[in-house]
Amino acid sequence: RNRGEERPGAFPARFCMYMGKPAVLDEISKSRDQLEEMEKYVVPDETGILYETRWSFVERDYQEVPWKTYLAEMERSDSLAAVREKLQEYLKKREKSGGLRKDFTSRFFEEMIQNIYVYLKESNIVFGQIFDSEEYETKRREAVLSVVGAHAFIDYLFDVLEGQKKNES
């Protein structure tokens, strides 16, 4: 990451600490298994610290996102700011409900990108014309690995889309 890109108090996406809970000797292997599961599946929040005590509260079920509604709103509006804000709020709500899982963020961003492809196709714009592939791939990878990266990826996508929309005007 470049200096100044991080949110105040946030660690870069590459940092994460896993904090177990105190355990008696007989339960250490169970605690280790929990920490390994967390490392595999959970997305670090802005602090970069994942606590074993909170892991059980992370939602495992994928909640459908109203993509058709968002796509229709993007197509009829001169500004994409409202959809951007709704997506950011959706992620914040998921974070507050216990955290994010990597499988959730992967699916969320796959679906979001598919809807952006549809949005651009209806405007006769090719995705690769407006997005730099190297920058896009870097930000997409970080989006799945940290909450900070997830929010930054949404901002990146919508900044580029807003810029394209202004160029069309």
Please give the residue ranges for each predicted region.
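Cytosolic nucleotide-utilizing catalytic cores of signal-transduction proteins
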Residues: 1-169
